[in-house]
Curated annotation (Swiss-Prot):
Functional pathway: Metabolic intermediate biosynthesis; chorismate biosynthesis; chorismate from D-erythrose 4-phosphate and phosphoenolpyruvate: step 6/7
EC number: 2.5.1.19
Cystine pairings recorded for this chain: none
NCBIfam families documented for this protein: aroA
Gene: aroA
The protein's name in its UniProt record: 3-phosphoshikimate 1-carboxyvinyltransferase
GO biological process, one term: amino acid biosynthetic process
Native source species: Chlamydia pneumoniae
Main location: cytoplasm
One MF annotation (Gene Ontology) recorded for this entry: 3-phosphoshikimate 1-carboxyvinyltransferase activity
Catalytic residues (positions): 307
PROSITE patterns: EPSP_SYNTHASE_1, EPSP_SYNTHASE_2
Binding site for phosphoenolpyruvate: 21, 92, 120, 166, 338, 379, 405
Family: Belongs to the EPSP synthase family.
Length: 445
């Protein structure tokens, strides 16, 4: 088991932000169904990327890996051989997108994944695909992985629940490639910036669609062509380094590099949100300058940057006033129930924090070193690491191998910036630290 041992320390200097997971996975998928050769530069090399590559190879795409470059020759037929078993690993995007893609033309395709992936909702997507003609068979009565699916999709209309943007994003892929016209309406759409990211890819590849309010129509039979694409930095990952920079003792701004300020990624909102709370942040070409600065708490709508909930919760512990994070119901259905996970772990550190039905209430409070657990969630692990850097006393964070999902060199990046983090392999032990639990009832009455 990989564990981080974190000693209180401040960060200084500059950081190179890893490439976007969301763009990397979409680029690989579209290149794999395109006609001709595609070149993807600066891709994120991670377990989710490997899961997407393996699935696309099973579909018949030729994928060659070079240092920071993928060369892909697509299979525009987009047909999986009958009885293919797709392993989505621990990737929600691979699970949802490949399920939709396999339903377009293929038959008797089975998808499976990690035990953790089984808790991710699928019913809204599967029901929409049924409305387009797909069929599903489950190996158990629980409607969980693994399951077997068959297409093809027919011209039809469906609505789809909008609680998770990946449902609509997966449908957009399927409806673009299906033989005939298809349309769907998103009911109560959430996480809108991430669906907009999927639409951006359709526009980049000149794949037609039209929209009216929350209804999207696709003529079908679209044929994407090969393309070149340079993956920019991941704003979701940048948020963790930015948080460390805001809390830093540095007298100079900390530069976050490899970021495209014009990119459409959802968690870019994190930076303007922190500016609105008083943080000092500036933009300079492909860099963001974060000045160590104080900031207030506030009422924060999380819908546009749902993946930033764990690190924003940590920052709220250091704010000058209380905070209410709301409209984050979908955070319960990520790699962990992030609302409960971050509450449980930060309470171990002394945080005054209380979960609500769709978010969190946080009162500023000092944090103390503790023995913590990531809940096998990369964003929880990274958020706790930043909290531990600015806590009083050492901390241990167990189950941190999950960080490779989006930020493979997370510890190395922070240590270059003078953080004191040690990676070690151990089991839970009698190792002790100064732990305090300050429960929310004392502060929230």
């Amino acid at each position: 088991m990989l564990t981080y041992k974190v000693s209180p320390s401040s960060v200084y200097g500059n950081a190179f932000i890893p490439s976007s997971k969301s763009h990397t996975l979409r680029a690989i998928l579209w290149a794999s169904v395109a006609e001709g050769k595609s070149i993807i530069y600066n891709y994120l090399d991670s377990p989710d990327t490997e899961a997407m590559i393996c699935a696309c190879k099973q579909m018949g795409a030729s994928i060659k890996k070079f240092p920071q470059i993928l060369e892909i020759v697509g299979n525009p037929l987009a047909i999986f051989p009958k009885y293919t078993l797709i392993d989505a690993g621990n990737s929600g995007i691979v699970l949802r997108f490949m399920t939709a893609l396999a339903c377009v033309f293929s038959k008797e395709i089975t998808v499976t994944g990690s035990s953790q992936l089984q808790r991710r909702p699928m019913a809204p997507l599967l029901q929409a695909l049924r409305n387009f003609g797909a069929s599903f068979h489950f190996s158990s009565d629980k409607s969980v992985l693994p399951f077997t699916m068959s297409g093809p999709l027919r011209s039809a209309y469906s609505d789809v629940e909008g609680s998770d943007s990946q449902f609509a994003s997966a449908l957009a892929v399927a409806c673009s490639l299906a033989e005939g016209p298809c349309s769907f309406t998103i009911i109560e759409p959430k996480e809108r910036p991430w669906f907009d990211l999927s639409l951006w890819w359709l526009e980049k590849l000149h794949l037609p669609y039209s929209c009216s309010d929350t209804t999207y129509s696709f003529p079908g039979s679209s044929h994407p062509q090969g393309f070149s694409y340079h993956v920019t930095g991941d704003f979701s990952s940048a948020a963790f380094i930015a948080a460390a920079a805001l809390l830093s003792k540095s007298l100079q701004p900390i530069r976050l590099r490899n970021l495209d300020i014009l990119d459409i990624q959802g968690d870019k909102i994190f930076f303007s949100l922190m500016q609105n709370l008083g943080a000092s942040i500036q933009y300079d070409n492909e860099e963001i300058l974060v000045f160590p600065s104080s900031f207030s708490g506030g009422s924060i709508d999380m819908d546009g940057c749902i993946d930033a909930l764990p690190i924003l919760t940590v920052l709220c512990c250091f704010a000058d006033s209380p905070s209410h994070l709301y409209n984050a119901r979908s955070a319960k259905d990520k790699e962990s129930d992030r609302i409960l996970a971050i509450t449980e772990e930060l309470q171990k550190m002394g945080a005054c924090i209380q979960p609500t039905h769709d978010g969190l209430l946080v009162n500023p409070s000092p944090l103390y070193g503790a023995v913590l657990d990531s809940h096998d969630d990369h964003r929880i692990a990274m958020a706790l690491t930043i909290a531990a850097l600015y806590a009083s006393g050492d901390s241990r964070i167990h189950n941190t191998a999950c960080v490779r999902k989006t930020f493979p060199n997370f510890v190395q990046t922070l240590n270059i910036m003078e953080a004191r983090i040690e990676e070690c392999h151990d089991n839970y032990s009698m190792w002790s630290t100064h732990k305090r639990k300050v429960f929310a009832r004392e502060s929230f009455g």
